[in-house]
Amino acid sequence: MLRLVRLLSILININGELIPREQATVSVFDSGFILGDGIWEGLRVHDGAIPFLDRHLKRLWEGAKALDLDMGLSQETLSARLFQTLKANQMTDHVHIRLMVTRGIKSTPYQDPAVTISGPTIVIIPEFKAPDPTLNDRGLRLYTVYTRRGYADVQDPRINSHSKLNCIFGCIQAAKAGYDEALMLDPHGHVATCNSTHFFIVRDGEVWTSSGDYCLDGITRRNVINVCKANDIPVFEKNFSLMQVYGADILSGWLLGSVLLSQS
């Protein structure tokens, strides 16, 4: 109950202004609402710090450049806004931040960026979200869905865009089948990723994850790979099949922290 009260009373940062949750809105003409034209980052807060913030902001700016979206401010200014928002909400731990940037407000509901009449809309939503301590005991159940991750020349899955229909289709299929998460394949039938988390397996002492061609190169994903390399643990970004998943010793994903997967 206390957690719900705290969530309902948060202040949300919209373009630098702190607004109570129940009053926080964006225009119906906003590019993100009309078209899903925007980018985002998911950030964790530990002991008052935002781990790997520089990498998150670098990826955000790279996504903006790919979309020809002018951020309209510096990384230092946006970083200051993030910490201002945390301070205003008295948040220091067990917090997840959704940082969203859209192209801005349009004069009419049309996809051409030329009809955008404002600067970008930048929203910071901080929420208390502690990892579920029971997840590793029971594990998450995966369902292999028929929706595939797509080619980069259709919609590059390595851009963290607001256009998430591909993952939403996978999520719906898994949920309707009674499972927790979707395991998604690439166009060639190799394992790509899950609908909302990355996917690793361990086989014969080796850590495997997908090639990365059909998924976001997540910050935590890259950190896991780097930690394995630093500790002489064999780790491979490679193509592998469902058959190899079924024969794995361990399945794991990263959803608010490391989570073991119980069934695939």
Language-model-detected regions and their locations in the chain:
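Conserved alpha/beta cores of soluble small-molecule-handling proteins
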Residues: 2-183, 187-188, 216, 221, ...
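Glycine- and Gly-Pro-enriched alpha-helical subdomains that act as flexible
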Residues: 183, 190-212, 217
